[in-house]
């Protein structure tokens, strides 16, 4: 028990000593650590390059993987078809609403 109390007191003293070092520093703008958080635009651009795509797929969505996927998306947009798809499956619901494909 005495060892635990002694350990806690020792750690508390260490925290007080280390904490008082930071309190001695001035918080002026020139010495502030927050000024180190900002870098110039040129420096930020040197490591944060964006991938650019020029005109190939502008305005187009991603290609649909399979015909079933496009049918599923059409069925999901119709609330009645979507509800029926929950009960009997989307292929059968799509067939009932939009006919055989």
UniProtKB/Swiss-Prot annotation:
Residues 20-52 form a propeptide. GO terms for biological process: biomineral tissue development; bone development; cellular response to insulin stimulus; glucose homeostasis; negative regulation of bone development; osteoblast differentiation; regulation of bone mineralization; regulation of cellular response to insulin stimulus. GO terms for molecular function: calcium ion binding; hormone activity; hydroxyapatite binding; structural constituent of bone. GO terms for cellular component: extracellular region. Its main location: secreted. Keywords: Biomineralization, Calcium, Cleavage on pair of basic residues, Disulfide bond, Gamma-carboxyglutamic acid, Hormone, Metal-binding, Secreted, Signal. The keyword Calcium applies. Gamma-carboxyglutamate residues are formed by vitamin K dependent carboxylation by GGCX. These residues are essential for the binding of calcium. This is Osteocalcin. It comes from Xenopus laevis. The gene is bglap.
